[in-house]
Regions:
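PRPP/pyrophosphate-binding module of the type I phosphoribosyltransferase fold
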Residues: 68-156
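Short secondary-structure boundary micro-motifs
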Residues: 56, 66-68
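Short, well-ordered alpha-helices that flank and scaffold nucleotide-derived cofactor binding pockets
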Residues: 24, 28, 59, 63, ...
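Short loop/helix-cap segments at secondary-structure boundaries that form the rim of catalytic
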Residues: 31, 63, 104-105
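Extended interfacial segments that mediate partner engagement and assembly in macromolecular machines
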Residues: 1-60, 83
């Protein structure tokens, strides 16, 4: 409920709570990270929503950690919202959607997003970053949602 309120109602007062949790995870597990890449929204979706929650989370983390935010990663094509799509539809929806304007200066980026369902958004963005020269890519998310197509590794 709080994540949806942040994402869709622009209730930024949740930002410090989520930001602190992500910062703790970053400082504990991702000490080799050298920059942040918030999942970009397409310009019309950002205009419609009024902000990008992933970018706001990354700004919070950047301010507290000193890590730079990559400003040249873009979503170049408007896509359907991922909610309600199957895993295959999500993959097709996000194909070739991210691009870099110029060089990637961060070698060990951390993708910042709010919720991961199938992981396809982060997967496609990570592929773009690796193709641009990233050594490895990590992901920081607030929550992992269970999707109908999701099967845990243990098969349960």
């Amino acid at each position: 409920m709080a994540i949806k309120s942040l994402k869709f109602r622009r209730n930024l007062y949740y930002l410090p709570v989520f930001g602190e949790l992500l910062l703790l995870a970053l400082q504990t597990h991702l000490k080799d990270a050298d920059g942040l890449v918030p999942v970009p929204l397409h310009r019309w979706r950002q205009a419609l929503r009024g902000f990008n929650q992933a970018h706001e989370l990354a700004r919070f983390i950047s301010h507290r950690s000193g890590l730079p935010i990559a400003k040249n990663v873009m979503r170049v094509r408007a896509t359907r919202t991922q909610s309600g799509l199957t895993a295959d539809e999500r993959k097709q929806n996000l194909k070739n959607v991210f691009e870099l304007a110029g060089q990637l200066t961060i070698r060990r980026p951390v993708i910042v997003d709010d919720v991961m369902t199938t992981g396809e958004t982060c997967n496609q963005l990570a592929r773009t970053l690796l193709a641009a020269g990233a050594e490895r890519v990590h992901v920081l998310i607030i929550a992992r949602a269970q999707h109908a197509d999701f099967t845990p590794a243990d098969g349960s």
